[in-house]
Regions:
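Glycine-centered tight turns that cap/initiate beta-strands
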Residues: 76, 147, 313-316, 363, ...
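Conserved small-domain helix->loop->beta segment predominantly found in fold-type I
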Residues: 271-274, 278-280, 289, 294-296, ...
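Conserved PLP-enzyme active-site core in the AAT-like
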Residues: 2-3, 11-13, 17-20, 79-310
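Short hydrophobic/aromatic beta-strand micro-patches
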Residues: 222, 344-346, 406-408
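Short amphipathic alpha-helical segments
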Residues: 52, 78, 279, 283, ...
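N-terminal "arm"/small-domain region of PLP-dependent enzymes with the aminotransferase-like
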Residues: 2-61, 69-70
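PLP-dependent enzyme catalytic core of the Aspartate aminotransferase-like
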Residues: 119-120, 128-130, 146, 166, ...
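Conserved N-terminal alpha-helix of the aminotransferase class I/II PLP-enzyme fold
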Residues: 39-91, 113-121
Length: 426
């Protein structure tokens, strides 16, 4: 094509060509551990990073490569690395950036699993997280010191459905020479493209809207190609000679996709959380319909949120697409085509009412996931955010009365009918 493909076209075609061996139009599942070298020189070139190619599926696989190229195209990045899960993506990102004794700033509005990973598991690596309030951006800047290595936010926070001001936080990051990492899982690139708003690195749980069907686990790291890893000397993984590769300096050699290369040949190679080719295939298949699904998700969610906001047993609805929502202006700025499909609301009966309501639902599936074609529900305080203190739960938007919904693509009248019958039993 001579013209630049649109988003819908990229979702179907980016990274994929008919299989050269068989002519198969669907991307094949390359279910193999390793790949045959042409000769000794070819093998040496691959291992020395002098040529691109496949060595071992722990590091790279052709099915995985199509997925990576497609997500990078949709996000507007220079390169991507697919891994086993969203959590694995976060570990590898920070492995690229951090040394023992370093810290990073993270928004207080995050998925409960990320709060736990950052606050507990990362301590074992000597990495400190410093929590900042997305409603008071001075708390991001005030905690930065000479050992701070990054700022981490979610574009659309889980579980509260809160849009975060990426551009203003990006300004703070650039002022202090720090990369901005944005988890774009709940928005997906269909709604928000964080790199266009100042992000340097984007991560996803591919398990959610990108895969979209609740059948596969995966994660991805997208390199925005926007950060100078050599300027400050704070990021030796990219800026200093690597003894494993004969003194190669990744940023000098690979330029605006050096972060993605480091994530693959240092992080994924040594830590090992590889995505399976079959999961990569399933996620690719789901990704083709992302624009269609995401718009239906958003349209249904807007209808459901509006209906809930007028129900007498509902205390509050936290959905940025509602004109009355305090986050509505940010939603219109960053995601005018929709406010996402994951949001929370509170029941007047508190914790007990929330549990009873969840158990009364019939169409909704009660499980710990979001971004499925099917409508999903969970009571965060008793499940996903259970490990947090009461104060942390409230700050994360997971108070005792909170119910999280992930609205699917079913007939919206059926979704509302199920909510109505469950509310009648509370």
């Amino acid at each position: 094509m001579t013209r630049t493909p649109g988003f819908n076209t990229l979702a179907v075609h980016a990274g994929a060509k008919p299989d050269p061996a068989t002519g198969a139009r669907a991307t094949p599942i390359y279910q193999t551990t390793s790949f045959v070298f042409d000769d000794a020189d070819h093998a040496a070139s691959l291992f020395g990073l002098k040529a691109f190619g496949n060595i071992y599926t722990r590091i790279m696989n052709p099915t995985q490569a199509v997925l990576e190229e497609r997500v990078a195209a949709l996000e507007g990045g220079t390169a991507a690395l697919a891994v086993a899960s969203g959590h694995a993506a976060q570990v590898i990102v920070f492995h690229n950036l951090m040394q023992p004794g370093d810290n990073f700033i993270a928004a207080n509005k995050l998925y409960g699993g990320s709060i736990n990973q950052f606050g507990h598991a990362f301590k074992n690596y000597g990495w400190e997280v410093r929590w900042a309030d997305v409603n008071d951006l001075s708390t991001f800047e005030n905690q930065i010191d000479d050992r701070t290595k990054a700022i981490f936010i979610e574009s659309l926070a889980n579980p509260g459905g809160v849009f975060v001001d990426i551009e203003k936080i990006g300004d703070i990051a650039r002022k202090h020479g720090l990369p901005l990492i944005v988890d774009n899982t709940l928005a997906s690139p269909y709604l928000v493209r964080p790199i266009e708003h100042g992000a340097d690195i984007v991560v996803h749980s591919l398990t959610k809207f990108i895969g979209g069907h609740g059948n596969s686990i995966g994660g991805v790291i997208v390199d925005g190609g926007t950060f100078d890893w050599s300027k400050s000397g704070k990021y030796p993984m990219m800026s200093e000679p690597r003894p494993e590769y004969g003194g190669l300096v990744l940023h000098e050699t690979f330029g605006n996709f050096a972060f993605a290369i480091a994530a693959r040949v240092l992080g994924l190679r040594d830590l090992g959380p590889a995505i399976s080719p079959f999961n990569a295939f399933l996620i690719l298949t789901g990704l083709e319909t992302l624009p269609l699904r995401m718009q239906r998700h958003c349209d249904n969610a807007a209808s459901v949120a509006g209906w809930l906001s007028n129900h007498p047993k509902v205390a509050w609805v936290n959905y940025p697409g509602l004109p009355s929502d305090k986050n509505n202006a940010l939603q219109k700025k960053y995601s005018p085509q929709g406010a996402g499909a994951v949001f929370t609301f509170g029941l007047k009966g508190g914790y007990e009412a929330g549990v009873k309501f969840v158990e009364a639902l019939e169409l909704f599936s009660h499980l710990a996931n979001v971004g499925d074609t099917k409508s999903l529900v969970i009571h965060p305080a008793s499940t996903t955010h259970r490990q947090l203190s009461d104060e942390q739960k409230v700050k994360a938007g997971a108070g005792p009365d909170t119910v999280r919904l992930s609205i699917g693509i079913e007939d919206v009248n059926d979704i509302v009918a199920d909510l109505e019958q469950a509310l009648s039993k509370v």
